[in-house]
Amino acid sequence: MAKKLTRKEKQINELYVETTLDIGKNADNWISFLKRAGYNYKYRFDEQVLIYAQKPDAIACAETKIWNKRLKRWINKGSKGIALITERNGELGLRFVFDLSDTNSNVYGRKFRLWKAEERYTNDIIEALENRFGTMEDKTNLSFAIMSTICNYVVDNIQDYLEELKLVCQNSKLQELSEEQLENIFLNLVTYSTIALTMSRCNLDVDRYLLKNNFDTIEKFNTFETMSILGTATRDFSREMLLEISKTIINIEKEEEKKNNTFEKLNKPIYNEEKTKGSVENGYDLHKEKQLSNTRLNNRKDNESENEIGQIRSNEIGIFETKQEGNIYDANREQPINRSL
């Protein structure tokens, strides 16, 4: 016999369905969601939706035990957790995560810094994307490189999602389309959506390259089932892009940190052994925080119950550490240009 849902579980499930339908009502709502979901790109689509519904400005979420044990950060008194849906053995439940803004740290806390796609990393990112996903049509800058990569990747990998979409088109505005129209609309919208989410997380100006009318067909995805497939495809494709970008940036920063540490050691004054011992005995162990900094969050493969250990991992943290046609906006020309995606 299935477990009866609690009032809170019913409330959160309803919130998930309502918010999923709401973000698909029009282009503005969908774009707004995409620009925030980039910060939670490792979470499943349903989790991204619930984070957006309860705390739209969240940038890094984890359960209390992760903040406490791994990051030595503490939940602020009175903070309200973000409820996410879990499923075990076919039964629904809830777990709660807290955003970085809901936490604080003492002297032993880890200094928290999300990765940033700074301009100095551009060439390395472009090279990594091309090595991972294949030759780009345009790599004039990081924005065009990301767009070219996503266009190729979505075309090559969208078929399974498209087949799922065809099974749930009934009772949606998509059912009035021919099969060819459905394929073109889905391919274009997933491509544009993946570009918007990925570029937003890289702090690139989406509005300079994509127009709002690129997302107008979102209104045809007017059922929970069709929106779920669109959202899942967008999340899956953007996640692959952002994992590669983040890995590249973190590797560069680790190498830079190694060089800095080596330089500091070479230039470090030699202290009297007795003075060093005395400082430790008096509670001024300058190496304590450095020992804590060796803690790293585990990377886990994506699965149905992926938790935030994979969401907030060491990679996110710094310590001292068929063709489709569409309009993409060219900022240099100050007008939309027709590009083959």
Each predicted region: which residue ranges?
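Short cationic/low-complexity microdomains
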Residues: 308-312
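N-terminal accessory/interface modules of nucleic-acid-binding and processing proteins
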Residues: 1-300, 304, 318-324, 329, ...
